[in-house]
């Protein structure tokens, strides 16, 4: 990656391109390390509106969340939780220390954290999980737009557990949070 006189160029094993920039932007490489997330979080935290254009395309936003006090072998460190939106379908968590440097990335299947601080992974995961549950509950409330009269799903392939068969061409009528009727397509009155 290079940026010279307002022109950014990139080239890696999967992509190459260039663009003329008229403002701040961050190149987030396809092969980004977890430490690069920390650099991005810091750049976003210092950007106007905590947003930056991403190269080769897109935009990222950061939300600065919880501070957590950690201790390992008598040493204490305060770390801060950052959530970056715009890299995928869900926000990505990263932890920075008090100086704004990368401290860690923790996940249930992969964690990158300084040697000696491995014991903090569970604490940080718990904070992230609490945030994730709260976010999903908020989304469920904000995004749930159930029609007052219900809705029908037609052309359903339904598994009938009583007879252990699948049935094609079925309609499922949902009113509120309850399945009101199930029948073959065209057999349920959808007008009421």
Map each language-model feature to its residues.
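Gly/Pro-enriched, hydrophobic low-complexity segments
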Residues: 80-112, 186
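Aromatic-rich beta-strand edge motifs centered on tyrosine
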Residues: 1-3, 93-98, 113-119, 172-174
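Solvent-exposed helix/loop surface patches that form functional interfaces
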Residues: 1-78, 103-106, 126-130
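Histidine-rich, glycine-flanked metal-binding segment
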Residues: 163-192
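Extracellular/periplasmic ectodomains of large secreted or surface enzymes and adhesion receptors
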Residues: 114-155, 188
């Amino acid at each position: 990656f290079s940026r010279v006189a307002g022109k950014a160029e990139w080239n890696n094993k999967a992509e190459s391109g260039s663009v003329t920039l008229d403002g701040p932007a961050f190149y987030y490489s396809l092969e980004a390390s977890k430490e690069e997330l920390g650099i991005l979080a810091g750049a976003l935290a210092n950007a106007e509106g905590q947003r930056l254009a991403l190269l080769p395309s897109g935009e990222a936003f950061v939300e600065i969340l919880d501070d957590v006090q950690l201790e390992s072998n008598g040493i204490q460190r305060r770390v801060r939780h950052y959530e970056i939106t715009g890299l995928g379908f869900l926000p990505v968590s990263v932890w920075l220390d008090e100086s704004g440097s990368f401290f860690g990335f923790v996940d249930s299947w992969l964690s990158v954290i300084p040697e000696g601080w491995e014991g903090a992974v569970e604490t940080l995961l718990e904070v992230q999980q609490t945030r994730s549950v709260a976010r999903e509950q908020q989304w469920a409330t904000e995004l749930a737009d159930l029609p007052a009269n219900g809705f029908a799903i037609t052309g359903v392939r339904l598994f009938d557990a009583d007879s252990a068969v699948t049935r094609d061409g079925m309609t499922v009528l949902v009113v509120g949070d309850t399945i009101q009727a199930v029948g073959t397509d065209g057999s349920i009155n959808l007008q009421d």
